[in-house]
């Protein structure tokens, strides 16, 4: 799922393949790009993850904790496609 495409059917492809194979774990890299930097809210992240759970994903790989040294000026080192959920978040 992406910011502009939150169709549960798209993510259901992965869970359907896992069911056919007999795999119980369905993993998805999650929350890599929900919106622009520093504009995501915890409620938006929860709604996004709820859609993944509805699609049959049962293992979340959270992509959103970028390292930035304390001495780096705000906003620090930011990865272009990651949620910024860290101590520097406004």
Feature roles, as predicted:
Residues 1-90:
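Carbohydrate-binding surfaces of carbohydrate-active enzymes
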């Amino acid at each position: 799922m992406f910011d502009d495409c939150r169709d549960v059917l798209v993510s259901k492809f992965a869970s359907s393949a896992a069911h056919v194979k007999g795999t119980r774990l369905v993993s998805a890299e999650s929350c890599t790009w929900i919106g622009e930097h520093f504009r995501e809210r915890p409620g938006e992240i929860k709604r996004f993850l709820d859609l993944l759970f509805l699609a049959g994903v049962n293992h979340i790989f959270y992509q959103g904790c970028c390292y930035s040294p304390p001495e780096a000026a705000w906003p620090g080192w930011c990865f272009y496609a990651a949620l910024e959920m860290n101590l520097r978040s406004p």
